[in-house]
């Protein structure tokens, strides 16, 4: 009984419900939120907010390295001759 419920009916029913509502999948939340909320690019929906969060983090790291490591190495103010 448990194997049959967990094998076929439970995942199929859950997947259909989640696909319709667009719960944890994320891919379904994108197309569902875009038509509902006009101007989702402002950061009202979940998918558009995830993109800007990842970009600044990647951009901040190279800026810090360029200003810190490259700047000090080229200037030699730390006493390191290059």
UniProtKB/Swiss-Prot annotation:
- Keyword set, alphabetical order: Cleavage on pair of basic residues, Secreted, Signal
So which residues are the signal peptide here? 1-17
**Compositionally biased region (Basic residues):** 50-60
Q: Which residues form the propeptide?
A: 38-82
Instruction: Give GO cellular component annotations, separated by semicolons.
Output: extracellular region
Tell me the segments the record calls region Disordered: 16-60
The transmembrane segments are: none
Q: Which family does it belong to?
A: Belongs to the non-disulfide-bridged peptide (NDBP) superfamily. Short antimicrobial peptide (group 4) family.
Q: List the protein's name.
A: Putative antimicrobial peptide 7848
Query: Organism classification, top ranks?
Result: Eukaryota, Metazoa, Ecdysozoa, Arthropoda, Chelicerata
């Amino acid at each position: 009984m448990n194997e049959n419920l967990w094998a076929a009916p439970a995942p199929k029913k859950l997947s259909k419900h989640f696909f319709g509502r667009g719960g944890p999948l994320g891919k379904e939340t994108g197309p569902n939120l875009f038509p509902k909320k006009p101007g989702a690019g402002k950061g009202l929906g979940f998918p558009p907010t995830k993109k800007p969060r990842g970009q600044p983090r990647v951009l901040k790291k190279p800026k810090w390295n360029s200003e810190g490591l490259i700047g000090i190495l080229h200037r030699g103010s730390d006493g390191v001759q290059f």
